[in-house]
Amino acid sequence: MYAPASTRSWQAGRERVLYRISDYRDCQSHGPTIAERVWTAWWQDSGLKVGDVAEHLQDMTNPHKLPTGFVAHDGDDYVGSAFLIHCDLEERPQYLPWVAALWVEEGRRRSGVARALMQAATQRAAELGHEASYLCCQRDLEAYYINCGWTVLERGVGKHDLTMLTFSTNI
């Protein structure tokens, strides 16, 4: 079973900043912030309301099935989050599971938080018996994910011209 990542640290100038990756079910107090970030980044033009996204988070409280979520936090402060879900790209429903809604607060970016969140999600996928995880992104983010160990499967997918990537969990 997934164990929360140990406390990680990084140096920002002279300030030492710590964060921890936890299962969403242990950090549900961050739910309203996560819902707002996810809604603002990906759903505000879709007709969904923030409350709809918050309601979806209720489905992420069972560690033995999808969907599930992960939270990066510094004590009570939200740092970032990621989901592991059934499908994130309606044009490719045959692939499962998907790392989705990866978000890191602007002041905490470029510090390894996103990579740690992806690692937690892909580790959970392996624990659930999946040999690979999938992710989609805009073309300008493709190089970042490749650098994190993901492999491009397909480019130009769907109406948003997304890149689809995979990560082998080697179970």
What are these regions (language model features)?
Residues P4, C136-R139, C148, E154-I171:
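C-terminal "cap" of GNAT-fold acetyltransferases
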Residues G69-V71, D77-C87, W98, W103:
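Conserved beta-strand in the GNAT
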Residues A125-C137:
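Conserved GNAT acetyl-CoA-binding A-motif
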Residues S29, A35-Q58:
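Conserved GNAT-fold acetyl-CoA-binding loop/helix
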Residues M1-T33, N170-I171:
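Conserved N-terminal entry element of GNAT/NAT acetyltransferase domains
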Residues V104, R110-Q123:
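Conserved acetyl-CoA-binding loop-helix of GNAT-fold acetyltransferases
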Residues M60-K65:
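Short loop/turn motifs at secondary-structure junctions and domain boundaries
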